[in-house]
Amino acid sequence: MKFKVNNKEVYASTGGQPFDKNKPLIIFVHGSGLSHITWVLQTRYFAFHGYSVLAIDLPGHGYSEGPSIKSIEEQGKWVADVIDAVVMKEASLVGHSQGCLITLECASQFPNKVRSLALMGGAGAIPMNPELLELAEKGDPKAVDLMMDWAHGPAGHFGGHAVPGLHHINIGGTIVINGSVKNALGVDFRACDNYKNGFEAAKKIKCPTINILGDKDRMCPVKEGKKLADSIKSSEIVIIENCGHMILLEEADKALAILKKFIINHHPSK
């Protein structure tokens, strides 16, 4: 589905079903340099069970018009603009990694627009390794290889993707194919590194929130995820065992089961 946000063309996957304004809305926000395709194993369920789904491509990512937005605060506002653009009053937000920072910021700035918040592989701050940041800003594809290697837990390195023929780590190849290492991944990494408002934003969250963490996550370790959860008033924590940072791919079924229970409880469909 393509639509306009702030006069720029935006693409979002609707999970295989037409967008319906009469159904509750769930917006899925991807991580650094990635796109809507990371959510394919979660979005279809909700799209076929009474929800309208938007797995968005952030500006400058996937099929969305650029340029990439350079700060987490502005990206959070942009998600609120998406809700307005599709003429909806509110949405449940699901974010992964950088998407957690973005959805956290959106829920903080616009509490009346966010019904529930699911943070997957999140933390209150995501400081970047200086060498990795430099590689990404130079447009070096090695940045993608390092990111995907570091993002996956031990089991994720051996495959086992729920979709036959696909491999978890190879999803990073979409960044290289799209030529977006510098202009998407580099910008995203810099935005994460610059963002210092996470814990202040967390204190302002009013909606029900869940933190889904992987016990083998090296990018946003469990202890950092717990710090964020402790800063949010109405928050719960679920830890998935033997799982790295790419929870939505490494343990897609478990992630979906957790999301189903949480969203259906706090934002039921008719």
Locate each region found by the language model.
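Active-site loop/oxyanion-hole signature of alpha/beta-hydrolase fold enzymes
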Residues: N7-G15, V40-F48, S52-Q98, A257
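Short beta-strand/loop motif that positions the catalytic acidic residue
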Residues: I205, N211-L213, D217
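Active-site glycine-rich loops that stabilize anionic/oxyanionic intermediates
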Residues: G31-L34, S97
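Conserved alpha/beta-hydrolase "acid-adjacent" motif
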Residues: R218-E224
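Conserved alpha/beta-hydrolase catalytic His-Asp/Glu region
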Residues: E134-K204
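Flexible "cap/lid" loop of the alpha/beta hydrolase fold
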Residues: L101-L146
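Catalytic active-site module of serine/aspartate enzymes centered on a nucleophile-bearing elbow/loop
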Residues: S235-K270
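Alpha/beta-hydrolase fold catalytic core
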Residues: M1-I27, F48-Y51, M88-K89, K260-K270
